[in-house]
Amino acid sequence: MDIKEIALGQIRDSIATKQKCIDSILGDITKAGEMVSKVLQSGNTVYLCGNGGSSCDASHIAAELVVRYKSGNERKALPALSLSGDSAVLTACSNDYGYEEIFARQIEAFGRKGDLLIGLSTSGNSKNVLLALEKAKTRGVKTISLLGGDGGRIKNLSDLDIIVPSKVTARIQESHILIGHILCSIVEYNLFKME
């Protein structure tokens, strides 16, 4: 095997995972797009959280909503925030309450009825994401989970689960950012009639 074959194998595996997404979760993705659109249209806020690569995806999606998704689409900023961005809050909460509480504590502080929390976890077992989703429920915050594998312990905790049909972390993360881009595209179409 040479490096070209390695690259080709990764690309083919990624394409196969995206095809499985079309076959099994397309309806859930469009439902999520409608949910995000309604929350933003009503003036509420979208929060996102995750760990590691999922944290990066959460920040990426939040940035696309605040700034814009498609180049050339001039529109107003939309209220979206990644809960991974404030190092002072993350370290203070980790020190005082434990790492598991870093997202739930922020939802307790900022989450309002009608807002939305999108939790990302490739395994579906991230304790801090799970606790944030549970806290969101107590605050009247709607919830969407982007998961992988069998959905883990987070499965069925949210108003809507989108479970990427793969057990490979890289394929799940690639699919999560694609789903995030689709959500942003649906939002720009629904709110601003931008394609």
From Swiss-Prot:
GO terms for molecular function: carbohydrate derivative binding; D-sedoheptulose 7-phosphate isomerase activity; zinc ion binding. One of its GO terms (cellular component) is cytoplasm. It catalyses: 2 D-sedoheptulose 7-phosphate = D-glycero-alpha-D-manno-heptose 7-phosphate + D-glycero-beta-D-manno-heptose 7-phosphate. The lineage of its organism: Bacteria, Pseudomonadati, Spirochaetota, Spirochaetia, Leptospirales. It is found in: Cytoplasm. This is Phosphoheptose isomerase. Its EC number is 5.3.1.28. InterPro entries: GmhA/DiaA, Phosphoheptose_Isoase, SIS_dom, SIS_dom_sf, SIS_GmhA/DiaA_subfam. Catalyzes the isomerization of sedoheptulose 7-phosphate in D-glycero-D-manno-heptose 7-phosphate. GO terms for biological process: carbohydrate metabolic process; D-glycero-D-manno-heptose 7-phosphate biosynthetic process. CDD domains: SIS_GmhA. It comes from Leptospira borgpetersenii serovar Hardjo-bovis (strain JB197). Keywords: Carbohydrate metabolism, Cytoplasm, Isomerase, Metal-binding, Zinc. Transmembrane segments: none annotated. Binds 1 zinc ion per subunit. The gene is gmhA. Belongs to the SIS family. GmhA subfamily. Zn(2+) binds at H60, E64, Q173, H181. Pfam families: SIS_2.
